Amino acid sequence: MNEAETIRYHAAHNGRPAELDLLDQTKLPGTLTRLVCTTIDQTHDAIQRLVVRGAPAIGIAAAYGVTLTPVDAESNSSLPEAQARYRQTIDYLATSRPTAVNLFWALDRMRAIVDDFSGPVAELRERLVTEAIRIHDDDRQMCRSIGCHGATLLADCKSVMTHCNAGSLATSMWGTALAPMYHLHESGHSLEVFADETRPLLQGARLTAWELHQAGIPVTVCTDSMSGSLMRQGRVDAVIVGADRIAANGDVANKIGTYPLAVLAKYHNIPFYVAAPTNTFDSELESGDLIPIEQRSADEVSYPCGTDSPRQTPEGVAVVNPAFDVTPAELVTALITEKGVISEPDTAKVRAHLGL
């Protein structure tokens, strides 16, 4: 069994409760440990604390989390009562992180199962487990497809830069932004990856560098402020990142620091690619200005090594810590999805790609 597998699920069996088994990414790269959730509160906390993170992964985790709803199929609970409890769980898990639309997409799929069901209560849980597994399996196929489409754009590159972590740790398999790198690596194509550290939580330095190194893909960590210098030196052939939400016009919400990276890439005439599944698109939002941006604790900036370590900002000084920023579509060379590539995205192209 792969100990680095991001998400596992163990169905209830012989009186043993169902378990959502997560790789604890807050402990990487120093410690490889897992966190087992058996309640919806534990699942909510794991998503909120970034034990599991990455837009596709939190959607999968939330879907499995719905199945942990305490509904006793052997009791006299009526179907309407059970449905009400599942809906309550879905609403609760939706509050764990506000920006990643994959979370709401996965929970909407689970809600549809609850709303449309008309059989025994015990069978409803089975249907929900089946749907969560299907969401997990769909994500694996998405990773393969994005890897294939993205590889065609990076085939002539010798080095690429990426931001945050949009790899296997953020999904069920290869990831989104890192999927083309895995695809090319399997094909024997040598590609160096610059992983910028991604402050304040260092997902690039801690997670992307770790998983690529584990896979044998050459990776070099650089500070966030070093990116422009590397581009000016001609050491970066392309930039590729993931996304947590994409508006109808192609504007992209991704980890804070993505927007300045896109500006730098534009200035240096370097392609800037965004890789994300179609369920990351929010066609109801006309532009990125409408995307809700999660504001996280100031402690993540003031105590970068944890609150038990020395404070790195002066006491009493204000700290701003948005988790995401928005990159305008005009800075995006192409969007890469499991369906293909949207070059120079705009509203018309996005709608056509999504079949709207």
From Swiss-Prot:
Which GO molecular-function terms appear in the entry? S-methyl-5-thioribose-1-phosphate isomerase activity
**What processes does the entry annotate via GO biological process terms?**
L-methionine salvage from methylthioadenosine
Q: Which Pfam families match?
A: IF-2B (PF01008)
Annotated site, Transition state stabilizer, chain positions: C164
Q: From what superkingdom does this record's organism come?
A: Bacteria
Annotated pathway, please? Amino-acid biosynthesis; L-methionine biosynthesis via salvage pathway; L-methionine from S-methyl-5-thio-alpha-D-ribose 1-phosphate: step 1/6
Alphabetical UniProt keywords: Amino-acid biosynthesis, Isomerase, Methionine biosynthesis
Q: Does the keyword Amino-acid biosynthesis apply?
A: yes
Q: Which reaction does it catalyse?
A: 5-(methylsulfanyl)-alpha-D-ribose 1-phosphate = 5-(methylsulfanyl)-D-ribulose 1-phosphate
Q: Which residues form the active site?
A: D244 (proton donor)
The EC class name is isomerase
EC nos: 5.3.1.23
Q: Which residues bind substrate?
A: R53, G54, A55, R97, Q203, N254, K255
Job of this protein: Catalyzes the interconversion of methylthioribose-1-phosphate (MTR-1-P) into methylthioribulose-1-phosphate (MTRu-1-P).
What family classification does the UniProt entry report for this protein? Belongs to the eIF-2B alpha/beta/delta subunits family. MtnA subfamily.
Tell me the PANTHER family matching this sequence: METHYLTHIORIBOSE-1-PHOSPHATE ISOMERASE
HAMAP family xref list = Salvage_MtnA
The name of this protein is Methylthioribose-1-phosphate isomerase
Species, as recorded: Rhodopirellula baltica (strain DSM 10527 / NCIMB 13988 / SH1)
